[in-house]
């Protein structure tokens, strides 16, 4: 069968839920037996998300093959249970880089290189290649930003051309836009949505489906009004409204038969779909079957924007739903723990578990170390991720080994005891973008340890994103003092450490949250939540 494409655009404002919509449609298609992938288009000039501030962009999601990508790829993976690749995130930076490289190589044979056709052709080539490399029958394409943004215009033109080239029944458009509810008048206002569709039609794109994003379900009158002014069938107007968890969205869409209608429009067979396990998971997330509520402190330096740690948050929810407890997340800015006037007991005294989050740089590091010490000394279940792992080593070296000046060379290049140091392969690296130790790496687990018990096997693969490692010169004295190295890389890097004397004290250089799935939680997060819940 010919490749099929579902292009999702957004209107009125950003963060309206395009990523969740794409992930939900993808999940419902996959559960019908179709091979599906999803492509996120980001119109910014950055080549990737790797050097962007989390406050600007949210989490940097790392794929199995080591790409630093938009957090929407995390939504795709979690909902669809399909691994994304570096080809699934297309940025304007990547597109222009390839076009300029081809021009320098003489590939355009002396032509004047222009947005049309050269840039738009490159965009289409990259979309098609992502579909091909993932063996997809159906490819979802999410165009970041909103219709009308100047940065998005070449991408919208490219997908307009894609429909012309691939055929009327092989490329369809789904447009999602805000439908604002005015509490004063008690009505849903559709005018902004209408204008966003008018803008799309000016570009030459007629939506096949419209998803109205509102606080409440769309009533029949509102749907008829939208249909009239957008030239879209009434039964192709779908409602996406506020719910307790984004994992409910596929259930809402399925109840309105959106995917069945999409398959009909694409001239594809509709198939039976079983959402029993998903509905059970959603009920557990909502706490319907919860045995108890647990308080988890998340200590980091970007906690004012929760999306900076979205995969960790979701991994906690997955593990909690799996064992039937409801997590209450307490976000703590690590800099708030650095002041001597703050009483750690007041902040951490009522939590059942502590996670020290990833991050870079010296800001807030001492606050994280205080949280780690508090967890270790008060025997509170603890999980350290990436930088949290490295600072666990620093804390242990200072407070157990008595190396009071121990530190990471990232924080203090001249530290007397550099227990964390730059990876050998990083010492001659001068560029920041795409140069860390990235992607899935082999971890060899030590039998008889907590890590081995959690994973249930000797060799595992987890994703990474770091430049620093535990200094091999200090491993022996750390182990002599009671720290257990339970996981190492093929070349001997320390990957996982634990303290068997504590209820649960585990830290890892990896990011196991990136591989956590709703119905298949990360083993490390599952072990942590079990310890927190005392189950």
From Swiss-Prot:
It comes from Saccharolobus solfataricus (strain ATCC 35092 / DSM 1617 / JCM 11322 / P2) (Sulfolobus solfataricus). The keyword ATP-binding applies. It is an enzyme of class 6 (ligase). Homotetramer in the presence of ATP and UTP. The enzyme dissociates into homodimers in the absence of substrate nucleotides. GO terms for biological process: 'de novo' CTP biosynthetic process; CTP biosynthetic process; pyrimidine nucleobase biosynthetic process. Allosterically activated by GTP, when glutamine is the substrate; GTP has no effect on the reaction when ammonia is the substrate. The allosteric effector GTP functions by stabilizing the protein conformation that binds the tetrahedral intermediate(s) formed during glutamine hydrolysis. Inhibited by the product CTP, via allosteric rather than competitive inhibition. ATP binds at residues 15-20, 72, 243. Mg(2+) binds at residues 72, 142. HAMAP family: PyrG (MF_01227). CTP binds at residues 14, 149-151, 189-194, 225. UTP binds at residues 14, 189-194, 225. Residues 1-268 are annotated as: Amidoligase domain. It catalyses: UTP + L-glutamine + ATP + H2O = CTP + L-glutamate + ADP + phosphate + 2 H(+); L-glutamine + H2O = L-glutamate + NH4(+); UTP + NH4(+) + ATP = CTP + ADP + phosphate + 2 H(+). One of its GO terms (molecular function) is ATP binding. Belongs to the CTP synthase family. This is CTP synthase.
């Amino acid at each position: 069968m010919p490749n099929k494409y579902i292009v999702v655009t957004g209107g009125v404002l950003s963060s309206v839920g395009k990523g969740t919509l794409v992930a939900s449609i993808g999940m419902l298609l996959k559960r019908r037996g179709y091979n599906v992938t999803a492509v996120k288009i980001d119109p910014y000039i950055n080549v990737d998300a790797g050097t962007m501030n989390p406050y600007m962009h949210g989490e940097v999601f790392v794929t199995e093959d080591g790409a630093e990508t938009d957090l929407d790829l995390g939504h795709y993976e979690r909902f669809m249970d399909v691994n994304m690749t570096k080809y699934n995130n297309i940025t304007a930076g990547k597109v222009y880089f390839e076009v300029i490289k081809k021009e320098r190589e003489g590939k355009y044979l002396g032509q004047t290189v222009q947005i049309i056709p050269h840039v738009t052709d490159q965009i289409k080539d990259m979309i098609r290649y992502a579909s091909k490399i993932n063996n997809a029958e159906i490819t979802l394409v999410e165009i970041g930003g909103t219709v009308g943004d100047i940065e998005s215009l070449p991408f919208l033109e490219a997908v307009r051309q894609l429909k012309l080239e691939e055929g009327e029944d092989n490329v369809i458009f789904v447009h999602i836009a805000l439908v604002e509810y005015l509490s004063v008048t008690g009505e849903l206002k559709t005018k902004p949505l209408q204008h966003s569709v008018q803008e799309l039609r000016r570009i030459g794109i007629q939506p096949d489906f419209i998803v109205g994003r509102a606080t409440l379900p769309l009533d029949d009158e509102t749907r008829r009004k939208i249909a009239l002014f957008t030239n879209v069938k009434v039964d192709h107007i779908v409602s996406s409204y506020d719910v307790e968890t984004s994992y409910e969205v596929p259930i809402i869409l399925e109840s309105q038969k959106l995917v069945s209608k999409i398959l009909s429009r694409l001239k594809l067979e509709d198939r039976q779909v079983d959402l029993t396990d998903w509905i059970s998971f959603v009920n557990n997330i909502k706490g319907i079957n919860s045995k108890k509520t647990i308080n988890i402190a998340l200590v980091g330096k970007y906690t004012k924007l929760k999306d900076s740690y979205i995969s960790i948050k979701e991994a906690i929810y997955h593990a909690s739903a799996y064992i039937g407890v409801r997590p209450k997340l307490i976000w703590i800015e690590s800099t708030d723990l650095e002041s001597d006037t703050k009483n750690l007991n007041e902040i951490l005294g009522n939590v059942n578990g502590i996670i020290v989050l990833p991050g870079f740089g010296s800001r807030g590091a001492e606050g994280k170390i205080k949280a780690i010490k508090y967890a270790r000394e008060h025997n509170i279940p603890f999980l350290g991720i990436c930088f949290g792992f490295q600072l666990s080593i620093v804390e242990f070296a200072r407070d157990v080994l008595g190396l009071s000046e121990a530190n990471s060379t990232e924080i203090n290049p001249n530290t007397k005891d550099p227990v964390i140091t730059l990876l050998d392969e990083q010492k001659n690296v001068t560029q920041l973008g795409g140069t860390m130790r990235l992607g899935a790496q082999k971890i060899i687990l030590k039998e008889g340890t907590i890590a081995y018990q959690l994973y249930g096997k000797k060799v595992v693969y987890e994703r990474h994103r770091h430049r620093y490692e535990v200094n091999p010169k200090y491993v022996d004295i750390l182990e002599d003092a009671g720290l257990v190295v339970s996981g190492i890389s093929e070349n001997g890097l320390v990957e996982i450490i634990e303290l068997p004397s504590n209820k649960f004290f585990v830290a890892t250089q990896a990011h196991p949250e990136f591989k956590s799935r709703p119905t298949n939680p990360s083993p490390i997060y599952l072990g942590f939540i079990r310890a927190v819940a005392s189950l």
